[in-house]
Design a protein with these regions (language model features):
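C-terminal structural segments of small proteins and small subunits
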Residues: 44-75
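Absolute protein N-terminus
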Residues: 1-2
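Short alpha-helix capping/helix-loop boundary micro-motifs
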Residues: 23-26
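A structural micro-motif recognizing beta-strand termini
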Residues: 17-20
Length: 75
């Protein structure tokens, strides 16, 4: 499952970060690295962008970028 598919209020753990070159490096620099827990806080009215909580802070990313982040949803 990818981060863009996770519902509001749900949590998951990052398993892999995809993307090419600068995009991948930017995601990693923002703290989106494997084995990190993420929580979807809210989604904009039109569905893009999404706000997530990672490492104790809120981060807003485009849905297109979130599609490059593989996660394992916590049950």
């Amino acid at each position: 499952m990818t981060l863009d598919k996770l519902s509001v209020g749900k949590c998951g753990t990052i398993t892999a970060v995809g993307g090419e070159g600068a995009l991948r490096l930017r995601l990693l620099d923002m703290g989106l690295i494997p084995k990190t827990k993420v929580n979807v806080v809210k989604v904009a009215p039109m569905g893009d962008p999404i706000e997530i909580r990672v490492r104790g802070y809120e981060l807003t990313i485009r849905k297109e970028d979130a599609a490059n982040i593989e996660i394992q949803e916590e049950k």
